[in-house]
A protein has these predicted regions:
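A short, compositionally biased
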Residues: 23-30
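ATP-dependent carboxylate-amine ligase
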Residues: 2-6, 16, 27, 37-42, ...
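Short acidic, glycine-rich loop/turn motifs
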Residues: 12, 33-37
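Predominantly soluble domains enriched in secretory-pathway, periplasmic, or organellar proteins
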Residues: 9
Length: 207
């Protein structure tokens, strides 16, 4: 279908039409980008997670293709603030929340956990919900997440849903978001940075 059409490449490889370089993610993503042979532009975003650099570079590629000025592209990326439970950082009276509860699959779950592990923050807590629509891969995918958690040094991990409950795990488990709410009311965390991630149907955004 794409034969004969113009292709625009983007990524962190030097040969890409739109090349990006990660600066840091502490906790917000900061990166540089340039068109092939052009000048570098630095962008400080309001997105959590170094994995979001590819999404940002895709937006850059679309903008440059349609002739948007490079400074305007960088400004738009800096000003964008997620409001859809995707890579949101929210500070409450008691804790700091990293909310990524719109969707979850094995790749995005691993990326979120790895990025959270790299964040230099105190008392890291995770509330992770089942990943839906995985079919026959459900059992293995959730066990892989649990094994990844076992290899990390997190202060506390809560697993939500029947798929996580069916794994070999040592973490605390909950049937659904309502059980988590009850636990949070009874033993409210204080001074924690909490990653909340799971499929949308797990309703973790309601916590």
């Amino acid at each position: 279908i794409a034969e004969g059409l113009e292709a625009v490449t983007y990524g962190q490889a030097e040969e890409a039409d739109i090349c990006g370089k990660l600066i840091d993610c502490a906790p917000y993503l900061r990166f540089q980008w340039r068109k092939r042979g052009g000048e570098w532009h630095e962008v400080s975003t309001q997105l959590i997670g170094s994995y979001n650099i590819d999404n940002a570079l895709c937006a850059v590629a679309v903008g440059t293709y349609f002739g948007v000025a490079e400074q305007e592209i960088s400004a738009a990326l800096s000003e964008y603030a997620p409001t859809n439970n995707r890579s949101q950082l929210t500070k409450t009276e008691h804790n700091t929340l990293v909310v990524d509860a719109y969707n979850a699959n094995p790749t995005s779950m691993r990326a979120a956990i790895d990025n959270f592990a790299l964040m230099d923050v105190p008392h890291k807590m995770l509330i992770l919900g089942d990943m839906k629509e995985l079919g026959e891969a459900t059992e293995a995918a959730h066990q892989e997440v649990v094994d990844l958690l076992d290899a990390r040094d997190f202060a506390e991990v809560w697993l939500v849903g029947p798929a996580f409950a069916a794994t070999r795990h040592t973490q605390r488990t909950f049937a659904d978001a309502e059980e988590v709410k009850a636990a949070l009311e009874a033993e409210r965390p204080e001074g924690c940075t909490i990653l909340i991630k799971g499929s949308n149907s797990m309703k973790l955004a309601s916590l």
